[in-house]
From Swiss-Prot:
<dbReference type="InterPro" id="IPR005996">
    <property type="entry name" value="Ribosomal_uL30_bac-type"/>
</dbReference>
<dbReference type="GO" id="GO:0003735">
    <property type="term" value="F:structural constituent of ribosome"/>
</dbReference>
<comment type="similarity">
    <text>Belongs to the universal ribosomal protein uL30 family.</text>
</comment>
<protein>
    <recommendedName>
        <fullName>Large ribosomal subunit protein uL30</fullName>
    </recommendedName>
</protein>
<dbReference type="InterPro" id="IPR018038">
    <property type="entry name" value="Ribosomal_uL30_CS"/>
</dbReference>
<dbReference type="GO" id="GO:0006412">
    <property type="term" value="P:translation"/>
</dbReference>
<dbReference type="GO" id="GO:0022625">
    <property type="term" value="C:cytosolic large ribosomal subunit"/>
</dbReference>
<keyword id="KW-0687">Ribonucleoprotein</keyword>
<keyword id="KW-0689">Ribosomal protein</keyword>
<comment type="subunit">
    <text>Part of the 50S ribosomal subunit.</text>
</comment>
<dbReference type="InterPro" id="IPR016082">
    <property type="entry name" value="Ribosomal_uL30_ferredoxin-like"/>
</dbReference>
<dbReference type="InterPro" id="IPR036919">
    <property type="entry name" value="Ribo_uL30_ferredoxin-like_sf"/>
</dbReference>
<dbReference type="Pfam" id="PF00327">
    <property type="entry name" value="Ribosomal_L30"/>
</dbReference>
Length: 60
C-alpha cells in the first residue's frame, strides 16, 4: 500500500477530546510536525476527524 505524509498545521487549543486523541494516535504533538503513515482505512478514519488541523500528501 501507499503511504501518506501528514503534517499538523493548526493547534489543538479549543479542539475536542476526540480530535486531540486522534492526533496523538497519529503521532502528532506539535504544529509543523510531520509523520508518514500507511494509507489504510484506520488512518483515513483518524484523518477524517482532524481534517481541519492537518494537511495530507501522498508519498509514492
Amino acid at each position: 500500500m501507499a503511504d501518506v505524509k501528514i503534517t499538523q498545521v493548526r493547534s489543538t487549543i479549543g479542539a475536542r477530546w476526540k480530535q486531540r486523541e486522534s492526533l496523538k494516535t497519529l503521532g502528532l504533538r506539535k504544529i509543523r510536525q510531520t509523520v508518514v503513515r500507511e494509507d489504510n482505512a484506520q488512518t483515513r478514519g483518524l484523518l477524517q476527524v482532524v481534517r481541519h488541523l492537518v494537511t495530507v500528501e501522498d508519498v509514492k
